[in-house]
Structure formats: structure tokens, C-alpha cells
UniProtKB/Swiss-Prot annotation:
It comes from Streptococcus pyogenes serotype M3 (strain ATCC BAA-595 / MGAS315). Pfam families: LacAB_rpiB (PF02502). This is Galactose-6-phosphate isomerase subunit LacB 1. Belongs to the LacAB/RpiB family. One of its GO terms (biological process) is galactose catabolic process.
Length: 171
């Protein structure tokens, strides 16, 4: 299984700990950065993780920023992503089993590394429970997404992504 992971500069150490944990469990980790503590912004990393999951390059994603709020909002803007910001096992399992979440988000300064690893492990192992009710809920979420599919400026991230491709991971 391939897991995409991304973070901002505030939680690089926490992301590396999670990445090492996932590798120790035998998962392939695709690390979308950031890789140091130079100031950067989470939307790029949420976008990268989300696009990897939607395209099939990764099976699931993990997004981490200081509180988790920003990067989780960013990744949820990628069409086809259902990400849950969690800090406990119950929420993570509900997200996967009932809403078929494909990305999990954390506040790396809110949730400790060991707890994040335990939650991620349970999230990965949990299975979506396909019921008529769950399918209807997911369809309603997808409808909201498709209803607003036309971005005002589809090239908004182009400059940032070009910098990324050149190895410039910060402002």
C-alpha cells in the first residue's frame, strides 16, 4: 500500500516520525514535503497529497500542519478527497468506515507522534462499510463538490508548483 504524506514547516519532525513509522510497518511512503523548517505554506502540500490519492499514485494520504485545520481544509478542496481532521481513534475509524475517507489530517502540535501513529495504523486497517445510507451521504458530499467544480483561476497554483518542481519548497 502506498501512503502519500505532506506537512508544513511547523511539523516537519512529526511528519518524519510518522513516515518512519509507516515504513517500519512495510508501507511505501510518498513524501511530498516539506523537508525542512524554512517557512512554507500548507495548501501546496495538501494539494500534492490530495492529487496523489485521487490519481491513484497513492492509496491513502496523511496531512499534518500545526493545528491540522489549514492543511485539512486545503486537501479537502481537491475533488475526490474526503479528509477528516482527527485527534482520536473514534473519529478516525468513523471517517474511514462510514464516510470512506481517503486522507487523514492531524494537528502535529495538538496530537503527539505516538498517538498519531496509532491512529494512522488503525485508519489504514479499517475498512469502509458500504451501506445504502453511507453511499447516500458520500453522494451528497460529492454533489457539493461537483456543484462548485469551476475554479475562478485554474492556474492559481502554477507559479508555486513550478517552484516546487525546481526544488524551492518555501516562500
Amino acid at each position: 500500500m502506498k501512503i502519500a504524506i505532506g506537512c508544513d514547516h511547523i511539523v516537519t519532525n512529526e511528519k518524519m516520525a510518522v513516515s518512519d513509522f509507516l515504513k517500519s510497518k512495510g508501507y511505501d511512503v510518498i513524501d511530498y514535503g516539506t523537508y525542512d523548517h524554512t517557512r512554507t505554506h500548507y495548501p501546496i502540500f495538501g494539494k500534492k497529497v490530495g492529487e496523489a490519492v485521487v490519481s491513484g499514485q497513492a492509496d491513502l494520504g496523511v496531512c499534518i500542519c500545526g493545528t491540522g485545520v489549514g492543511i485539512n481544509n486545503a486537501v479537502n478542496k481537491v475533488p475526490g478527497i474526503r479528509s477528516a481532521l482527527v485527534r482520536d481513534m473514534t473519529t478516525a475509524l468513523y471517517a474511514k468506515e462510514e464516510l470512506n475517507a481517503n486522507v487523514i489530517g492531524f494537528g502535529g502540535k495538538i496530537t503527539g507522534e505516538l498517538l498519531m501513529c496509532d491512529i494512522i495504523d488503525a485508519f489504514i486497517k479499517a475498512e469502509y462499510k458500504e451501506t445504502e445510507e453511507n453511499k447516500k451521504l458520500i453522494a451528497k458530499i460529492a454533489h457539493l463538490e461537483s456543484h462548485h467544480a469551476n475554479q475562478e483561476d485554474p492556474d492559481f497554483f502554477t507559479e508555486f508548483l513550478e517552484k516546487w518542481d525546481r526544488g524551492e519548497y518555501h516562500d
